[in-house]
Amino acid sequence: MRILLPLALWLSSSCAFAACPPAGRDRASLQALKAAKFAMPDAIARNVLAEGLLDCLADPDPSLRDGIAYEAFGAWMRAGTFDADELRTLRDGLYARLDGDDPGGFRKPFAALVLSEVARTDRVAPWMRAGERAGMVERAATFLESVRDYRGYENGVGWRHGIAHGADWAMQLALNPALDRAQLERLLTAVASQAWPPTATPTCSAKANASRGRCCPWRSVA
């Protein structure tokens, strides 16, 4: 409970999202943490930082959004750092970031990407109740169906690619043996809705196509 308090207080406070880097941190300290593979023995300090890094998912600087925030969450979750209550708190904070306007187009796709890591933790070592898992399936499907910003890579700000990140989330859920047929079909329907979306714009710049040969980088499934 003591460890969860900083996150719980934040979730119950203002809906406005804070700036990035988080309070008490700067780019140099975050890069140093990355070099240390995001190791933080102090669970309270780690959870306070996790709270702040949620806001970095909306930052237009890819070195903060993708290189620090996403990588930190991925490292912590793949190492089994968070317990079930902490994962619930993180999940709910990410859900909040799927709501409302997203003028920059980064917050929602990167919240979905980190939610794919949350879904993976439940696939590897189940902790969600059936109702929670069903709720996440619906959240993921709704997110995928809602994407209308088809921008991919943009020089200076990096990747958005909401469809790819939503697909990562759907994939981790679909790989979970706890899902039933109806839930799998719900995800399939959501994916199919984007196979030929109502409106679309090019997702990659010419430079990105030339340098990478594809629109979206592959994310780890394991």
Positions of predicted regions on the chain:
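Eukaryotic acidic, Ser/Thr-rich intrinsically disordered low-complexity regions
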Residues: D26-A35
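N-terminal signal peptide c-region/cleavage motif recognized by signal peptidases
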Residues: L11-C15
